[in-house]
Each structure stands twice: as C-alpha cells, then as structure tokens.
C-alpha cells in the first residue's frame, strides 16, 4: 500500500528511476526549462532547490543547503557559470552542465564535468543521477 504523503503517480514510486531524497540544486535561466525539469525531478522524489537564474542566486542557495548534485545551465543570460561550477566542485558536489551550445574544445573549467546538450531528455539526466542516489554523491 502506498503512503498517503506520496503524491507521485504509482508508476513513479519505487521504480528504478526513484530519486527519493536526492538534494539537487537547479541553475537555469529559462523559466520554462527550469519548471519542466523541477516538476519531473520532484515527481521522481528529488528535493530540488531553485531554480536559480543567476550564479549569485545559486551561490546564495548553496550556502543555505549544500546539494548532493547540481544541474547547471552553462550560459546564464550574459554570464557563464564556470565560477559557480568551480565552487561546486571544490565543495565535492557533482555537476551536470546543460547547454544549448558548447565550445570546442571545452573550457578548462568544464574538463571532467558531465556535459549534456539541450534539449536534454529526462532519460539522459536520470542516467547520471541514478548512480548518485545509490552512492549518496
């Protein structure tokens, strides 16, 4: 029997895609993309902080609650998020970078970081989040 506090659809409860308890920082300046990602991740049980539309807003949210993983748009309006990515990595937080375009070769700040090109599928994101759920980081 399912818990009355779990408002997710039955197919999302206890499945292989369960992200229950995962603390995610979402940094995305496109409100429609951020809303869709947040809604999907929360349906799978993740605790999503944000979305933050700027690096300053994301840094403030980080001080309130350090995430287990961060989904970060690389191009945020007129700024890039390389400084934020470096800060997250210094704290030991895995980062998944989302972007509509990547430079080739990747900037040094992105070396060793998971990078996904937008539009990104939910399956692609889950592929990288599920191992974090299992290990806790």
Regions found by a protein language model. Give the residues of each.
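Hydrophobic/aromatic residues positioned on beta-strands within the core alpha/beta folds
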Residues: 96-99
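Alpha4 helix (beta4-alpha4-beta5 surface) of REC/receiver domains from two-component response regulators
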Residues: 83, 90, 101-118, 123, ...
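Non-catalytic signal-transmission and effector/linker regions of two-component phosphorelay proteins
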Residues: 1-23, 56, 114-117, 121-137
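Acidic catalytic/metal-coordinating carboxylates
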Residues: 54, 80-83
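Acidic, metal-coordinating helix/loop segments flanking the phosphotransfer/catalytic sites
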Residues: 51-69
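Two-component/phosphorelay signaling modules centered on CheY-like receiver
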Residues: 31-50
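Conserved acidic carboxylate
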Residues: 28
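Active-site residues of response regulator receiver
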Residues: 73
């Amino acid at each position: 029997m399912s818990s009355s506090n779990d408002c997710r659809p039955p197919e999302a409860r206890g499945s292989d895609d369960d992200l229950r308890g995962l603390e995610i920082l979402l940094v995305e300046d496109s409100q429609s993309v951020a809303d869709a990602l947040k809604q999907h991740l929360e349906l799978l049980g993740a605790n999503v902080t944000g979305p933050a539309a700027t690096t300053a807003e994301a840094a403030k949210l980080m001080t309130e609650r350090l995430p287990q993983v961060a989904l970060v748009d690389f191009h945020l309006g007129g700024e890039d998020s390389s400084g934020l990515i470096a800060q997250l990595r210094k704290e030991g937080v895995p980062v998944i970078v989302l972007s509509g375009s990547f430079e080739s070769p990747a900037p040094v700040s992105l070396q060793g970081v998971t990078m996904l090109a937008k539009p990104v599928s939910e399956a692609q994101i889950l592929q990288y989040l599920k191992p974090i759920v299992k290990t806790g980081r």
